[in-house]
Curated annotation (Swiss-Prot):
This is Hydrogenase maturation factor HypA. NCBIfam families: hypA (TIGR00100), PRK03681.1 (NF002979), PRK12380.1 (NF009046). It comes from the Bacteria. Keywords: Metal-binding, Nickel, Zinc. Ni(2+) binds at H2. Belongs to the HypA/HybF family. It comes from Salmonella typhimurium (strain LT2 / SGSC1412 / ATCC 700720). InterPro entries: Hydgase_Ni_incorp_HypA/HybF_CS, HypA/HybF. Involved in the maturation of [NiFe] hydrogenases. Required for nickel insertion into the metal center of the hydrogenase. Zn(2+) binds at C73, C76, C90, C93. PROSITE patterns: HYPA (PS01249). GO terms for molecular function: nickel cation binding; zinc ion binding. GO terms for biological process: protein maturation; protein modification process.
Amino acid sequence: MHEITLCQRALELIEQQASAYGAKRVTAVWIKIGAFSCVETSALSFCFDLVCRGTIAEGCKLHLEEQEAECWCEHCQQYVTLLTHRVRRCPQCHSDTLRIVADDGLQIRRIEIDETED
């Protein structure tokens, strides 16, 4: 389960940004997950809650967005998009000669903070 490592690194980045803006608490985080990143959203959500315990991000709302992967089909010479790594065939010609062109992995898109004291 590499999701725990991804969440630990994401939390480091979130805490750095929150600290830079004087946050007392992180209230929400938006993360985009690439279709071919091999990340299970349920595992990521569970691990994120786990690593945030005892930090300024504890209890924050996690928003996950799945991103399509852009692929090039060698057979029909077209760009196609796929939403899951489980499908490796071109939706146009059903060939399996796809080359991944763009899949942004895992990105922290937005962090919502609270700057006030409780």
